[in-house]
UniProtKB/Swiss-Prot annotation:
Keyword Chaperone listed: yes
Comp. bias regions, Acidic residues: 607-619
Organism phylogeny: Bacteria, Bacillati, Bacillota, Clostridia, Eubacteriales
Role description: Acts as a chaperone.
Ranges of compositional bias, category Low complexity: 589-606
GO molecular function: ATP binding; ATP-dependent protein folding chaperone; unfolded protein binding
Region span, Disordered: 578-619
Protein name as annotated: Chaperone protein DnaK
Source organism of this protein record: Clostridium perfringens (strain SM101 / Type A)
Modified residues (Phosphothreonine): T175
InterPro entries according to UniProt: ATPase_NBD, Chaperone_DnaK, Heat_shock_70_CS, HSP70_C_sf, HSP70_peptide-bd_sf, Hsp_70_fam
Highest taxon listed in the record's lineage: Bacteria
Length: 619
């Protein structure tokens, strides 16, 4: 049975893990890192970059570099690149494709199934959008699970014998969640959850950006936030400063030539202290404490009941966050799990449960928001209360609001407000064919089904006639099957184009290498090669040089093959002249470097890649 991978699709960074030998293992990416920046960029030549390479060029290509797309999941937001609109699902799919490819390279087999995590406070539209992104990336998403729940799995896998009540504080790049769980005897049961899908490390960065920009504006009269390239430099500087302030009490922000005016170039050279950073972000930290209070209250849990506090998400490395959590809970947060990796590890454990690799683990999650319908007067009538264990099914009998009413519109809402208009609309559908009768007489059963992924289905049945209507909630911001299929085809086409582009680069690199090595060896051999032979080789070299920068890969391969064969004849002759001993330290098999010769021309060695090395000045 093929592996099911676990993916933490994060706002700023993503991570992928898999079960091996009964333990979750984080998979390193092609750059050798254990997490991958959730960044996508589009190049002028049509190439797409994902991850660290995309983040690295963001300053020089800010308009075509997309970050924090997760914040727009489940909305109608679109990114326009070169006249083409991309949905958040499509951009997220590009990140998932990168993670999928890294997992396949690590496992040595094709990966088609995944468990993907989402913030606990993601609504139905955001969860659907995540599933769509997986589908576009070529992944069958077997389960969507909440990030704090996944983290608790990673924390509790080796602690299943004793009962614990744990509080998971998950502050990521773009979202914040708190979950309280009962853990014991292999059962992970979520007691309550609360959160804010628009609160995270990005907001802490933004406070630093605004502070720097306002200070610069006061001194120079220029708002750097209006300059996209300058703003991108500010973003990188803010993130770097935030990270440095986790281990230092102050940091230097130095941005030379940030902009210019009539008086000349302008620079930023300022010091930011941890105390000032704490002052700038105090209300954000307090907001997380308020959400913790709400989670405890809705779960009817006191702080004395909590045995352990787990910190999840890179933003929990901020000292003020750690201090606030410690002061509020009265407990030292557990450092037993890596905040950047534990969510992906938990997803891998859930994948292991689905494949049978992990035994005796039962995950009981909850729905984060109340589900209901609009009734007379615009009231939101709840059917499934928040923090109900899922999967769940609830039904209730309703009736008509007018005499002889033959149809009813069911307006499905999600949220905690009393009035339907104040909550999020998940969908509307109509039940027709109701037998005419005075108001209040017809009996219409409305049933809500919510599956283990948190995806909602609603049905309405006229008890008298048996007529039924139903809807699987797919918000207007989600993609239709046709749109998903189109995006899947585009993603597959791009993957094939990317493969061809990579092959072309490798062949051209090999051509450069074989030309260099051949010319070098010819010079070293000197008079040992006749003028006629030298002329023939030089002609072959010129042929490779002529075609190597073109687009005809087959022509480059043929020219390389011709050069290799011609030089091989000379090397064989020299070999015989030296009585079977390799002369002058010359090895014809190595003349083109590790990847040259006919093998390179045919790209037989998939394990060998050329690398570009960038020389940087010492800072």
């Amino acid at each position: 049975m093929s592996k099911i991978i676990g993916i933490d699709l994060g706002t700023t960074n993503s991570c992928v893990a898999v079960m091996e030998g009964g333990e979750p293992v984080v998979i390193t990416n092609s750059e050798g890192a254990r997490t991958t920046p959730s960044v996508v960029s589009f190049q002028a030549n049509g190439e797409r970059l994902v991850g660290q390479v995309a983040k690295r060029q963001a300053i020089t290509n800010p308009e075509k570099t997309i970050m924090s797309i997760k914040r727009h999941m489940g909305t109608d937001y679109k990114v326009n690149i070169d006249g083409k609109d991309y949905t958040p699902q499509e951009i997220s799919a590009m990140i998932l494709q990168k993670l999928k490819a890294d997992a396949e390279a690590y496992l040595g087999e094709k990966v088609t199934e995944a468990v993907i995590t989402v913030p606990a406070y993601f609504n139905d539209a955001e969860r659907q959008a995540t599933k769509d992104a997986g589908r576009i990336a070529g992944l069958d998403v077997k389960r969507i699970i909440n990030e704090p729940t996944a983290a608790s799995l990673a924390y509790g896998l080796d602690k299943m014998d004793s009962a614990h009540k744990i509080l998971v504080y998950d502050l990521g790049g773009g979202t914040f969640d708190v979950s309280i769980l009962d853990l014991g005897d292999g059962v992970f049961e979520v007691v309550s959850t609360n959160g804010d899908a628009r609160l995270g490390g990005d907001d802490f960065d933004q406070r630093i950006i605004d502070y720097i920009a306002e200070d610069f504006k006061a001194q120079n009269g220029i708002d750097l936030r209006q300059d996209k390239m300058a703003l991108q430099r500010l973003k990188e500087a803010a993130e770097k400063a935030k990270i440095e302030l986790s281990s230092s009490t102050q940091t230097l922000i130095n941005l030379p030539f940030i902009t210019a005016d009539a008086t000349g170039p302008k620079h930023i050279d300022m010091t930011l202290t941890r105390a000032k950073f704490n002052e700038l972000t105090h209300d954000l930290v307090e907001r997380t404490i308020d959400i913790m209070k709400e989670a405890l209250k809705s779960g009817n849990v006191s702080l004395n009941d909590i045995d352990k506090v787990i910190l999840v998400g890179g933003s929990t490395r901020i000292p003020a966050v750690q201090e606030a959590v410690k002061n509020f809970t009265g407990k030292e947060p557990s450092k037993g799990v890596n905040p950047d990796e534990c969510v992906a590890m938990g997803a891998a454990i859930q994948a292991g449960v689905l494949t049978g690799d992990v035994k005796d683990v039962l995950l009981l999650d909850v729905t984060p928001l109340t589900l209901g319908i609009e009734t007379l007067g615009g009231v939101a009538t709840p059917l499934i209360e928040r923090n109900t264990t899922i999967p769940a099914r609830k039904s209730q009998i309703f009736s008509t609001a007018a005499d002889n009413q033959t149809s009813v519109e069911i307006h499905v809402v999600q949220g905690e407000r009393q009035m339907a208009a104040d909550n999020k609309t998940l969908g509307r559908f109509t039940l027709s064919g109701i037998a005419p009768a005075p108001r209040g007489i017809p009996q219409i059963e409305v049933a809500f089904d919510i599956d283990a992924n948190g995806i909602v289905k609603v049905s309405a049945t006229d008890k008298a006639t048996g007529k039924e209507a139903n809807i699987t909630i797919t918000a207007s911001t989600n993609l239709s099957d046709a749109e998903i299929d189109k995006a899947v085809k585009e993603a597959e086409q791009f993957a094939e184009e990317d493969k061809k582009r990579k092959e072309a680069i490798e062949v051209k690199n090999n051509a450069e290498q074989i030309v260099y090595q051949t010319e070098k060896t010819l010079n070293e051999l000197g008079d040992k090669v006749s003028a006629e032979e030298k002329s023939e080789i030089e002609a072959k070299i010129e042929e490779v040089k002529k075609v190597k920068d073109g687009d005809d890969i087959e022509a480059i391969k043929k020219a390389m093959e011709d050069l290799t064969q011609a030089f091989y004849k000379i090397s064989e002759k020299l070999y015989q002249q030296n009585g079977g001993a390799q002369g002058e330290g010359f090895d014809p098999n190595n003349m083109g470097g590790a990847n040259a010769g006919t093998g390179a021309a045919n790209s037989n060695d998939d394990n060998v890649v050329d690398a570009d090395f960038e020389v940087q000045d010492d800072k």
